[in-house]
Amino acid sequence: MRLILPADTEGIFLERKSRFTGVALVEGKKTLIHIHNTGRLPLLKKGKRVLLKRAESDRRKTGWDLLAVEHRNEFVFVHSGFHSIVAGKILEELFPGSTIESEKRFENSRFDFLIDRRTFVEVKGCTYEEDGVAMFPDAPTGRGRRHIEELIRSVKSGFKALLLILVFLESDCFLPNRSVDPAFSEIFWRALNSGVNIDVFRVKYDGEYLCSTEKLSICEEV
């Protein structure tokens, strides 16, 4: 998978003002930027280099969108608004010739994709790691737990289900983040044992392209 998404400029991150806004030094000026990610993003620290894309609308209070933040000699893509686009490209390669529909409803939930009317897909983006282990979530996520519960229910109803996890930073393998959200970790393993397929893909960003480089394994839980 290769998706072109060039950054428009580079800046220096200064602070996170709220859930969706931050301040960065852009072209020598303190500038309000939009952070399209509801996670805690612990790697987003003062002084870090960031890649930004100019906002398409002049009516917004924030003139720039945060795309990526520097972390250990690479840029980690943090804009969750592109997760579905990246996932769609990966699914096209995983299921060539299949019909892939987006935003499909099952009972009281809406999943990211439905493949050939029989496989529901939910996508999660991971931007946190410890000692080479990618972990999700970086903050408690009731919504994430509900999505996986619904994937399990879809399997019990005769569908197939896939949890697709996109890891955006250098990692050796993946684990659910038990220390941050024990309930999510519990339901993750329950899903794996209930017939939900879980695929983890490493996605790199170089300021020009998003590229899916390899499939990661699920670590052995200690």
From Swiss-Prot:
Signal peptide: none annotated. One of its GO terms (molecular function) is DNA binding. InterPro entries: SfsA, SfsA_C, SfsA_N. CDD domains: SfsA-like. It comes from the Bacteria. Disulfide bonds: none annotated. Transmembrane segments: none annotated. Belongs to the SfsA family. HAMAP family: SfsA. This is Sugar fermentation stimulation protein homolog. It comes from Thermotoga maritima (strain ATCC 43589 / DSM 3109 / JCM 10099 / NBRC 100826 / MSB8). The gene is sfsA.
